[in-house]
């Protein structure tokens, strides 16, 4: 590893050889790997790479301070050395002391003739497997940005192309979209939401185009006059009263126009309306608002509903009793009316002259009396309260 170790007595197996693909170490720098080709067949096809590689190895060995070997020491190893693989044959480099051969061999690829350089460069560029070490040797490679930006052949071809015959230019498209400078051949309109064409290709506005499409004729330019109201029709007058103003024109049996009043009078009475009934002003019906009528109807129904229960139901809470004759009451203070008198009073009640009422007398109830009378009330089902 150091110069003292490299110059040992065993010269048959040197630690490092300038031919072998091993590492060269220096005391003050990281290890440097000297690559050698592991494909002899490819190196034979590319001899200029072999020369460059050999000269490069010799150059590194000559610059190393610890290696001062001669030509005799370069052949010291034999084929049985474990450091050298037996499957590959290596060509030995020239002596290190021959500086002219070393420099010439190292600089030979750089000073190569133009023909040789182009030959190797073209071969490498065309195959595509091994790129050339120099970017300028390929004759087929175009110069980078030789012309100005955006001046390539593709851009020139795009700019040189003629527009397709079916395409519309931008100016024509804008004119087609906005429709500036157009005029309807029918009505002379200059602006319309949509321009249309007639059968001959002339421009029509949207209204004229739709009218022509639906009716098959040109749209009339003169607007139709508004229809006069029935009360102001020109040239019409009632054949009976000779008035010219009416809310509705009618016709008599002969088909002559009559006013609304004369027509209704003739329809209802069968005779012409007398002229004495003619009025200068048209009498209109005074219609009542519908909301007021509905309000009155609702209030009337509510009042009738409120009055009807009072007439049917009796507000007096006094009960009416019906008793049988010759039966005494078990309740003290209860007045019993005979059946005959009750029936007569019932007839009077129907007539509305008299009313049968239960009038209790003022007395005080005692608990003993209530307990004694509770049993007969439960047993006798024909009592006055049960029969009522």
From Swiss-Prot:
Assign the protein's first listed, main location to one coarse class: nucleus
Q: Which GO terms describe its cellular component?
A: nucleus
Q: Where is the composition biased (Low complexity)?
A: 297-315
According to its UniProt entry, one GO biological process term is:
positive regulation of transcription by RNA polymerase II
Q: Where in the cell is it found?
A: Nucleus
Q: Which UniProt keywords apply?
A: Activator, DNA-binding, Metal-binding, Nucleus, Repeat, Transcription, Transcription regulation, Zinc, Zinc-finger
Q: Which GO terms describe its molecular function?
A: DNA-binding transcription factor activity, RNA polymerase II-specific; RNA polymerase II cis-regulatory region sequence-specific DNA binding; zinc ion binding
Q: Where is the composition biased (Basic residues)?
A: 284-293
Please tell me in which tissues this protein is expressed: Highly expressed in heart and throughout the gut, with lower levels detected in lung, gonads, liver, and gall bladder.
Q: Which organism is it from?
A: Xenopus laevis (African clawed frog)
PANTHER family given in the database record = TRANSCRIPTION FACTOR GATA FAMILY MEMBER (PTHR10071), TRANSCRIPTION FACTOR GATA-5 (PTHR10071:SF289)
What is the designated name of this protein?
GATA-binding factor 5-B
Polar residues bias locations = 76-101
According to the UniProt entry, the coiled-coil residues are: none
Disordered as annotated region, ranges: 76-113, 280-333
Which InterPro entries does the record associate with it?
GATA_N (IPR008013), TF_GATA_4/5/6 (IPR016375), Transcription_factor_GATA (IPR039355), Znf_GATA (IPR000679), Znf_NHR/GATA (IPR013088)
Residue ranges annotated as zinc fingers (GATA-type) are 184-208, 238-262
